[in-house]
Amino acid sequence: MDATTIITQIATKAASASRTLSTSSREERDLVLIKIADNLEKNCDLILKANQIDMENAKSAGISQALLDRLLLTKQRVMDMAKGARDIAKLPDPLGQILIERNLANGLNLKQISVPFGVVGMVYEARPNV
């Protein structure tokens, strides 16, 4: 399977999950983050083995040492990613917050409320833990 097909499948699944998460409770969203952290920790060895393959491929492709240093995952970096997911779960819930509210001259009450905006995709060269 080529990279474009894989990325398209992942993006489609992410979009579906984002719709589900947008209507989920705070507790459900926090649980997803905790499960992400748990899975990062549980699968650390597998992640590091896959990263080793990435590192070997990058070296073969002539990637600079500076970029290789940023691409490298260590157990500590994976654990830091897990901690980051747990830290996000501890933050105040950003959804449903009234950001601006005012009464208009015509009697209407205008509110700006924070809502989920969907999936953001990011392509990066290195630094998988950032």
Where are these regions (language model features)?
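Substrate-binding/gating loop at the entrance of the active-site cleft, primarily
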Residues: 101-130
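N-terminal Rossmann-like NAD(P)+-binding subdomain of aldehyde/semialdehyde dehydrogenases
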Residues: 1-109
